[in-house]
Amino acid sequence: MFDSVKIAWLVALGAAQVAATALPAFNVNPNSVSVSGLSSGGYMAAQLGVAYSDVFNVGFGVFAGGPYDCARNQYYTSCMYNGYPSITTPTANMKSWSGNQIASVANLGQRKIYMWTGSSDTTVGPNVMNQLKAQLGNFDNSANVSYVTTTGAVHTFPTDFNGAGDNSCSLSTSPYISNCNYDGAGAALKWIYGSLNARNTGTLSGSVLSFAQSGSYGANGMDTTGYLYVPQSCASGATVCSLHVALHGCLQSYSSIGSRFIQNTGYNKWADTNNMIILYPQAIPDYTIHAIWNGGVLSNPNGCWDWVGWYGSNADQIGGVQMAAIVGQVKQIVSGFQG
């Protein structure tokens, strides 16, 4: 159990990284798991929410992502910028794979789904997000869906506070986190989980833990270290907690921007007052040229999550190596459930 494992706690992630330790188990209800992400992390969140809807059984959130399986049957750039990628074959694949290569699509009718786009996003714009909404509309319950557009926002993670080094809402550059006067993390979590306690806007009670993304918890294109935010209420194991997975976008991994995605997106503020652990898996730049879906070749120098088939033809299906690693992390964390 968690409190019997020696771990290295980081009060704040600084320039010096504490050596990663084994990923502990926590008293987390396995029926309280969700995921969200930005950009390639948004694509990955949709992949996990669809392919592993039995694991991410509360719901998922997508910030500036696109349709599930989008890049398999059209070149990946069709799924970017602000075009209208075809969802005909991807949606047909969801139906034909249901219950085999992916979990049953019937699950999606029971999941809470949150989607966000910036009206001025030219990297993965509103038209692409609209196609995701249309695709999921074949399976979801519209009463369970929230779709939000922030006027003037670009390709960024939206917050309502000024984190150190963050941008204005109209600026799409590193660290791709911006004060848009919109609490994206809070909006996603409140939609997915329902009513929550007010966030902690002061000093947080919890700590950040680094863990080894190795063995079944790691994969091609993933860094050797991942992170968890654990509120004080979840640390001892006395309280049953929930789990949310927060996925960074391209150029947002720890190797690119340090701890900013972990500290500045606002997830931890909500987790701290709601008995919620936040898991931050980490991708890493990969300069090797790989074959991708649809016959192309591409390297991954921006440390994106795999939404184009870099690491296998089954990248968005059960057993896709990055998804399997993240699911392995989730299953280890919830294995300490005492209910």
Curated annotation (Swiss-Prot):
InterPro entries referenced in this protein's UniProt entry, alphabetically: AB_hydrolase_fold, Peptidase_S9_cat
Active-site residues from the entry: 39, 121, 155
EC main group: hydrolase
One BP term from GO: proteolysis
Glycosylation (residues): 144
Organism of derivation: Talaromyces funiculosus
SUPFAM superfamilies, per database record: alpha/beta-Hydrolases
Compartment list: Secreted
Family: Belongs to the carbohydrate esterase 1 (CE1) family.
EC number(s) per entry: 3.1.1.75
Summary of activators and inhibitors of this protein: The enzyme is completely inhibited by dithiothreitol (DTT) and diisopropylfluorophosphate (DFP), and partially inhibited by HgCl(2) and by enzyme3-(p-nitrophenoxy)propane (EPNP). Activity is not affected by N-ethylmaleimide (NEM) or phenylmethylsulfonyl fluoride (PMSF).
Molecular function (Gene Ontology), one example: serine-type peptidase activity
Keywords, sorted A to Z: Disulfide bond, Glycoprotein, Hydrolase, Lipid degradation, Lipid metabolism, Secreted, Serine esterase, Signal
Name this polypeptide is given: Polyhydroxybutyrate depolymerase
Disulfide bond entries: 70-79, 169-180, 234-241, 250-304
Pfam families (UniProt xref): Peptidase_S9
Position of the signal peptide: 1-20
Catalysis performed (reactions): [(3R)-hydroxybutanoate](n) + H2O = [(3R)-hydroxybutanoate](n-1) + (R)-3-hydroxybutanoate + H(+)
Principal subcellular localisation of the protein: secreted
Protein task: Esterase involved in the hydrolysis of polyhydroxybutyrate, a microbial polyester that can be produced from renewable resources.
